[in-house]
Amino acid sequence: MGCDDKCGCAVPCPGGTGCRCASSARSGGGDHTTCSCGDHCGCNPCRCGRESQPTGRENRRAGCSCGDSCTCASCGSTTTTAPAATT
């Protein structure tokens, strides 16, 4: 899998180190691809921050773990509170 706009890379790729993927297979961890930014391909590294150590799936969106302040569209809503019941 290559880097794309979901991985923080410009499309079409302008070339250079800004859009280069590397496989962590070199470190013995199997064939797992990451962007040069260090995030997994297919996961937009939202600039608003990400959960450093997620405790559950409540903040996870398509393999991304977004911080509480994240409102970017690629991460989606991370609000975990249930909607208020209407009476």
From Swiss-Prot:
Molecular function in Gene Ontology: zinc ion binding
Coiled-coil ranges (or none): none
Tissue: Expressed in developing seeds.
Keywords, comma-separated and alphabetical: Metal-binding, Metal-thiolate cluster
Induction comment from the UniProt entry of this chain: By hydrogen peroxide, ethephon, abscicic acid (ABA) and salicylic acid (SA). Barely induced by heavy metals.
InterPro entries with a match to the protein in the record: Metallthion_15
Protein's UniProt keywords contain Metal-binding: yes
Disulfide bonds: none
Top-rank lineage group of the source organism: Eukaryota
Keyword Metal-binding assigned: yes
A Pfam family this chain is assigned to: Metallothio_PEC
Family stated for the protein in its record: Belongs to the metallothionein superfamily. Type 15 family.
Function: Metallothioneins have a high content of cysteine residues that bind various heavy metals.
PANTHER family xrefs: EC PROTEIN HOMOLOG (PTHR48198), METALLOTHIONEIN-LIKE PROTEIN 4A-RELATED (PTHR48198:SF1)
Name by which UniProt lists this protein: Class II metallothionein-like protein 1A
Source organism (scientific name): Oryza sativa subsp. japonica (Rice)
